[in-house]
Amino acid sequence: MKRRDTIVRYTAPERINHWITAFCFILAAVSGLGFLFPSFNWLMQIMGTPQLARILHPFVGVVMFASFIIMFFRYWHHNLINRDDIFWAKNIRKIVVNEEVGDTGRYNFGQKCVFWAAIIFLVLLLVSGVIIWRPYFAPAFSIPVIRFALMLHSFAAVALIVVIMVHIYAALWVKGTITAMVEGWVTSAWAKKHHPRWYREVRKTTEKKAE
């Protein structure tokens, strides 16, 4: 494929940032399910032993949060809701049958919902996780607070897992999306179809640099 037929969607640092977050999520989610459901205790072996999993789980969670915060500051301005997103949401039936609508920028309304849901649930996980983190912080809180934090942590964890499952499904559903995060590039045709406004902005910037 000729270079002019592709567009850089994610740079190497952006992709590394994404996959660090993804790797930490897998470790935290799998070990967390082992904590939450007794029948899934064997999942904790992903970190070695159940005892080691209980020690490492919160540290992995902190790394995941820190990594996602970097992503947040990189992309928050691309995820602000606008009129095109409302139009996109109103035509969700067309989206389901793989028909693109509206003048979508770098991210569509669905991707923006995933982004904001992820940051909300990650904040809840961090706050509740700190409260229940033994032996460092839990002793500073009362039993009722710890119990509430445990429920909140469990809810936020399951909710985030669902959000990420939707994220993965959408990435697999839209052909060419995985390539963007693995290799960093997308075809011009892909960009024109799925993110026309972003495509025009990138082309305009590229043309200015070439002058």
UniProtKB/Swiss-Prot annotation:
Heme b 1 binds at residues 18, 167. It is a multi-pass membrane protein. Residues 1-17, 73-112, 171-211 are cytoplasmic. One of its GO terms (biological process) is formate oxidation. The chain crosses the membrane at residues 18-32, 54-72, 113-130, 152-170. Belongs to the formate dehydrogenase gamma subunit family. This is Formate dehydrogenase, cytochrome b556(fdo) subunit. It comes from Escherichia coli (strain K12). The lineage of its organism: Bacteria, Pseudomonadati, Pseudomonadota, Gammaproteobacteria, Enterobacterales.
